[in-house]
Amino acid sequence: PLPLMSAPQHIYIGTDSGATTSKINAVWDNEEPVSKKVFQRPTNSQNGTEAVINGWIESVNIFLKDHNLTWAQVDGVGLAIPGPYQRYGVLDRSANLPLSFAGWDVHEDYSRALAKAAGRPVPLVMGNDGQFGGVAEARYARKDTKHSVLMLMPGSGLGCAYIDQNGLPIPGDTLASMEGAHMPAPLQMLGNIKP
């Protein structure tokens, strides 16, 4: 008799989109990382929303190929992207993204692109990049304790997250978590900067 072949392990893809760089990685269904190296590419937000979506899909395809994985193994995708949001899945005006991105239903567009690439619907969950990063890092920082965690993540802005004692974030009214930067500033009061 032929030896029993084990079924391929399933994965969950993470897409972390910043204003300038997007990152891709994945975890196995046992929550272990597929790779300890994050795959990074330019976001290309200056080229519009379609270019961003196409870049994410191309990046996922490269990641899958580089790790001998297939779309059939992808059980879900998470998208971390800066806020604020008009509502779940729809971006609002963000200081570090083009004005044309306000009102973009990124959840709908990415869901459609994922389904086309996979040949079937792929569950997609999205949220604020600071919030998602905070939940992940708090899990490691807290270990088995019941402490709250405040996380500050500098990038093109300052992503922030407060994670409560139960490991849950505070999303806020605009689902932007505790976005700590990209706030209006009186430039004339910051030294030699003219408004």
Predicted regions and their residues:
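Short, Lys/Arg-enriched N-terminal segments with co-localized hydrophobic residues
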Residues: 1-4
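Glycine/GP-enriched mid-protein hinge/lid loop-to-helix segment characteristic of carbohydrate kinases
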Residues: 7-11, 25-29, 33-49, 102, ...
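Short beta-strand segments
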Residues: 16, 78-82, 127, 150-157, ...
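Conserved Rossmann-like nucleotide-cofactor binding loop
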Residues: 20
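Short, well-ordered amphipathic alpha-helices
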Residues: 25, 57-65, 106-112
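N-terminal phosphate-binding loop and adjacent alpha-helix
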Residues: 33-72
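Glycine-rich phosphate-binding loop and adjoining helix at the ATP-binding site
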Residues: 45-54, 73-76, 83-150, 188
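Short, flexible coil/linker elements and helix-boundary hinge sites characteristic
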Residues: 65-68, 119, 167
